[in-house]
């Protein structure tokens, strides 16, 4: 086909089908960042420099992680969160009490394109050893269904509402627990002065059976105190009205999406959450629960091109 001018369109008949050939692909049909396929030498060098400080291999055991400075830093960051949130206090193990074991879990966090952006180390407790009535009582916490997320996006799209997302860093550490629970010291980070001591928990840890409920109660109580109302059917949906404007908040454990008919209400909600919790990954909704989302003036598009 000969070269085309900017506004020129050619047609051709192939086996009875009419094919329209455009010089440029329609921009409104492109999903993803248009410029992502163009990488300059400077961008490539910056990317290589960044990835040089990210470990690609996920350790299976903490002994392997301790040999990699990237993972050691991730483990130290996790323990720093424990100190900030006053999660526990070290003490001798009381008589007739059994401590719950702890272990490290290592994961590489990826963005919507599948690129590794962070090494995440998480200390979890071995909740399978908990005994009902002793270490925990109630465990149920509502979780949003994927259908609810899609309905949220559909409602926002039909009402021209921009949807944003945020993530609560180490969310379960904010949940207050009522039971008396003791856990073993983190492997590789034992206190040399008291190697036989244990930690008494004041807040929830990942792996505890009551941790999801403790976090949900903490977050929902905070929202209800700030003039939100909880959905009658979907207990993970919260609403706040100011005059004729509405702010909608959908919760999926520690991931939150929200949107409003008034952009000022979204900005105020961000400040409200930051005043109580340490937040991360705040911005326009682009990647959520494995779904890639692109919000445009002509609609909201959901796809999973990273898996193709």
Task: List the predicted regions and their residue ranges.
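Reverse-transcriptase-like RNA-dependent polymerase core
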Residues: 28-59, 108-134, 143, 169-199, ...
